[in-house]
Amino acid sequence: MKFVLLLSLIGFCWAQYDPHTADGRTAIVHLFEWRWADIAKECERYLAPKGFGGVQVSPPNENIIINNPSRPWWERYQPISYKICSRSGNENEFKDMVTRCNNVGVRIYVDAVINHMCGSGNSAGTHSTCGSYFNPNNREFSAVPYSAWYFNDNKCNGEINNYNDANQVRNCRLSGLLDLALDKDYVRTKVADYMNNLIDIGVAGFRLDAAKHMWPGDIKAVLDKLHNLNTKWFSQGSRPFIFQEVIDLGGEAIKGSEYFGNGRVTEFKYGAKLGTVIRKWNGEKMSYLKNWGEGWGFVPTDRALVFVDNHDNQRGHGAGGASILTFWDARMYKMAVGFMLAHPYGFTRVMSSYRRTRNFQNGKDVNDWIGPPNNNGVTKEVTINPDTTCGNDWVCEHRWRQIRNMVAFRNVVNGQPFANWWDNGSNQVAFSRGNRGFIVFNNDDWALSSTLQTGLPAGTYCDVISGDKVNGNCTGLKVNVGSDGKAHFSISNSAEDPFIAIHADSKL
């Protein structure tokens, strides 16, 4: 009995790090600004059959409507109430999505904006996505309700301007956003009520927006009020998966490690460093990736949520700077995402974006505010083209063959060790995941031609980067692995996709 009790305690303590994905699924996708109706369809027609574990959705709560500039993406990070009512859909549409996605084994993770309400400079009125009245000037949010007492103005009535002062970062206003007093039990209860409504509907967990701007103890107090996950889809006693947005590139007062007790943290160094390596900036080479992960000063693998780019830094916001790779850099981007999905470090998130017209002035994209594809503010449907790509300016990187097939690769090699590393001292590298998968990259300016130890059983394999295994045949390159586990690889430096990946399920 003691042993069982101990196990259940350990299970309880560790639950917030577990994404609760179905049957060995190892990656989630951020369907940024998608409508709930489109996500429900995508779970059924694509994400479930292709092995995706879950979806991070945009903030579902009521937000301010900003008309200057016209309906920017960032208006969704300015809450007005906790009603589920946004340009992605209403509460019934949200419930339908969660039910349909869970029913096919795809989890939903909500982007929870709980540090603040809208910006202090906005005018009073009902210009919100559900028409709720608010008055930022006197801190009135009647649909919650919050009043001035529930904000941090008595601790700090100005902006954050010194990131070496932890008190300022956590008590002052982030970009003018009214900072909630999460040390007050009333505020904690209102936030927990919102999150519990979502948990009861069936979500599996939360991204905590702006976690660095909240005290870890205040976050814990909110998490302690949360319900267990809905037993219709999750085992009894399951706790919500938590990943906290903590931008810690080093050199500031606040460290990501302060948040480990609450859940995982977003490792922003990951995409920034990987981008620098793939771009070959600052003398970086892929051969240096041999000790990728903790060896590069990242948080421990079981505390990391990793990504190549996110909705902020793909448009120059947040963290990472110019090295961040995005869909605009398609060739390098596919290599970076391929490396991430092949490497065992961290829990992985794939980005799915929308296109906009960029306009660089003095190195800054002055169009970085533009919201999702829309008709007069109504978000456009995600249409699917005959070639399985998306229309209406939705990029759908998660549907690119090279990325979708590497999500499957990660599932196949799950739990296998990082092994059989090879490099040429420059930008040609390869490694296996035990005896289940092997990947090789050529990011040099000359051809790769080498016989390498794959660690895989003998046979003919289909390269899942150049093609697919269909009815026992391969639409791309074939790789022959000998009885000694070795195979010959040739990759031109001018190849559209200068990498090859094979795995147990791609064996012909």
From Swiss-Prot:
Q: Catalytic activity, per the record? A: Endohydrolysis of (1->4)-alpha-D-glucosidic linkages in polysaccharides containing three or more (1->4)-alpha-linked D-glucose units
Q: Which GO terms describe its molecular function?
A: alpha-amylase activity; calcium ion binding; chloride ion binding
Q: Where in the cell is it found?
A: Secreted, Extracellular space
The residues that hold chloride are: 207, 310, 349
Q: Which GO terms describe its biological process?
A: carbohydrate catabolic process; carbohydrate metabolic process
Q: Which CDD domains match?
A: AmyAc_bac_euk_AmyA
**Cofactors:** Ca(2+); chloride
Signal sequence extent: 1-15
Active site located where? 209, 245
Residues at the site labelled Transition state stabilizer = 312
Q: Which family does it belong to?
A: Belongs to the glycosyl hydrolase 13 family.
Quaternary structure (record)? Monomer.
Designated name of the protein: Pancreatic alpha-amylase
The organism named in the record is Rattus norvegicus
Upper lineage ranks? Eukaryota, Metazoa, Chordata, Craniata, Vertebrata
